[in-house]
Regions:
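Contiguous segments within soluble domain cores/interaction surfaces
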Residues: 1-100, 105-110, 114-129
Length: 129
């Protein structure tokens, strides 16, 4: 998973990243980041299995407060060990609010946790002058 200020798909199928980060320093709370994106890449190196997958993304704050809960579907071709199938999912959000300094958890579940379950951390802190 990668966090960035700006991400765009290029005509040749690549992703351009600008402002990649692994923590956020904000001037005040609540924090309203103007541009907040994260990218996940999935790789499949087997020739069998599902091609349609459901993804569930949760952003969790203090006391298990859910800032975001979103579900979507993505499709992924079957691959093989010599040439794996890859898909990159770009999630852009302009409406997220971080209410206070905290290490927020991004929980990713694919196919109800059967195919994949991961948690990533993002510290959001008050900028020190």
């Amino acid at each position: 998973m990668c966090f960035a200020e700006h991400v765009r798909n290029t005509p040749d199928g690549k992703l351009d990243f600008l402002g990649v980060f692994d923590y956020m320093d904000v001037p005040e709370f609540p924090a309203y980041p103007a541009n907040f994106n994260f990218v996940m890449q999935f790789v499949k190196n087997v020739a069998v299995g599902r091609t349609e997958h459901k993804i569930h993304v949760s952003i969790i704050g203090d006391n298990d407060e859910r800032l975001i809960e979103e579900e979507s579907t993505f499709f992924m071709a079957n691959g093989n060990p010599d040439r794996p199938s890859k898909v990159s999912l770009l999630w852009q959000n302009e409406n997220i609010v971080f209410p206070k300094p905290f290490v927020y958890s991004f929980k990713i579940r694919v196919d109800d946790g059967v195919s994949l379950m991961r948690t990533h951390q993002l510290p959001v802190m008050l900028r020190q002058s």
